[in-house]
Swiss-Prot record:
Keyword Transferase part of the UniProt annotation: yes
Summary of the function given for this chain in its UniProt record: Dual specificity protein kinase which acts as an essential component of the MAP kinase signal transduction pathway. Binding of extracellular ligands such as growth factors, cytokines and hormones to their cell-surface receptors activates RAS and this initiates RAF1 activation. RAF1 then further activates the dual-specificity protein kinases MAP2K1/MEK1 and MAP2K2/MEK2.
Protein name: Dual specificity mitogen-activated protein kinase kinase 1
Keyword field contains Electron transport: no
SUPFAM superfamilies, per database record: Protein kinase-like (PK-like)
GO cellular component: anchoring junction; centrosome; membrane; mitochondrion; nucleus; vesicle
Domain notes: The proline-rich region localized between residues 270 and 307 is important for the binding to RAF1 and activation of MAP2K1/MEK1.
Organism, scientific name: Pan troglodytes
EC identifiers of the protein: 2.7.12.2
């Protein structure tokens, strides 16, 4: 294909196949990418930011282990450790996820190949991807660094996250899931606060979605700790669909709104301790069966019970009523939004299109919220000199 103006983005694959850092054509025309961006109905700021990222990305070239300098550890989980790193040849700061896998070379190469679809995932609601490679028993996935970290980290500092902020988060998650489904036929498979990243510019982006079936299979044993966000139908072994992502998406704002993982549901006494007042509604009522003695390992906050075993948690999710937001504290629209996400039967659960026009989302979309300002003051980040409101969410 002859080069056209503007200058094309170079995504060069490694010659030996150990680092497949580019697309199959080895060269993607910026003009074609810009055309794809136009299809996404982005505002001017979002388009400029995506183009800036893609322009930076062409400086990267082939990714090699020796080219990285570790700055700090950002977190661990989902089968890997994530570091903030400097890519010395380009000067870019990235997030590098290292996944240690004892696998055969053919499987490893298949995983690297499958990860290449991430080069095509360019959206304001998806974390940017620089490339993936294998070195010394570890697969490295190199991504855009989000300086606000993940929402589970933010929640630990905030205690609880306000409804207005969660409205902006919900919009970004719906738009991110819609983009993955409509443009790439991808389901996320692991929506939870730790996989929603934020930054000081007010952007909210999804990461760690299931593009590589082989990687999911290879890491199957390491997913035990995140199963608490799985939908009832996943535990029952029925067909997985995007509706399962909706359940996880509904559970996440409940956790962030009340300040702890909401299964088992907090009782009236605990809610009173949380919110400093008597709370009305179903969430404050005694559950139909005695509450299990434990809590999930992923819980934090006021719940001091011993951890709930995974089989107890599975039984609770499948057989007990789904979590709800307490009324009297949150708006009716927010409560209804969550309820529609957390319907046990996936066929009755709201879909992405229905959620996008839900009253809570419409209201949140219209609200002026300084997400960047809230985030920076909450976690002690310096705000950029040109702060943005809600980052075009």
């Amino acid at each position: 294909m002859p080069k056209k103006k503007p200058t094309p983005i170079q995504l060069n694959p490694a010659p030996d196949g150990s680092a497949v850092n580019g697309t199959s054509s080895a060269e993607t025309n910026l003009e074609a990418l810009q055309k794809k961006l136009e299809e996404l109905e982005l505002d001017e700021q979002q388009r400029k930011r995506l183009e800036a990222f893609l322009t930076q990305k062409q400086k990267v070239g082939e990714l090699k282990d020796d080219d990285f300098e570790k700055i700090s550890e950002l977190g661990a989980g989902n089968g890997g450790v994530v570091f903030k790193v400097s890519h010395k040849p380009s000067g870019l700061v990235m997030a590098r996820k290292l996944i240690h896998l004892e696998i055969k070379p053919a499987i490893r190469n298949q995983i690297i190949r499958e990860l290449q679809v991430l080069h095509e995932c360019n959206s304001p609601y998806i974390v940017g991807f620089y490339g993936a490679f294998y070195s010394d028993g570890e697969i490295s996935i190199c991504m855009e660094h989000m300086d606000g970290g993940s929402l589970d980290q933010v929640l630990k500092k905030a205690g609880r996250i306000p409804e207005q902020i969660l409205g902006k988060v919900s919009i970004a998650v719906i738009k991110g899931l819609t983009y993955l489904r409509e443009k790439h036929k991808i389901m996320h498979r692991d929506v939870q606060p730790s996989n929603i990243l934020v930054n000081s510019r007010g952007e909210i982006k999804l990461c760690d979605f299931g593009v590589s079936g082989q990687l999911i299979d290879s890491m199957a044993n390491s997913f035990v700790g995140t199963r608490s966000y799985m939908s009832p139908e996943r535990f029952q072994g029925t067909h997985y669909s995007v509706q399962s992502d909706i359940w996880s998406m509904g559970l996440s704002p409940v956790e962030m709104a009340v300040g702890r993982y909401p299964i088992p549901s907090p009782d009236a006494k605990e809610l009173e301790l949380m919110f400093g007042c008597q709370v009305e509604g179903d969430a404050a009522e005694t559950p139909p069966r005695p509450r299990t003695p434990g809590r999930p390992l992923s819980s934090y906050g006021m719940d001091s019970r011993p951890p709930m075993a995974i089989f107890e948690l599975l039984d609770y999710i499948v057989n007990e009523p789904p979590p709800k937001l307490p009324s009297g504290v949150f708006s009716l629209e927010f409560q209804d939004f969550v309820n529609k996400c957390l319907i046990k039967n996936p066929a009755e659960r709201a879909d992405l299109k229905q959620l996008m026009v839900h009253a809570f989302i419409k209201r949140s979309d219209a609200e002026e919220v300084d997400f960047a300002g809230w985030l920076c003051s909450t976690i002690g980040l310096n705000q950029p000199s040109t702060p943005t409101h809600a980052a075009g969410v």
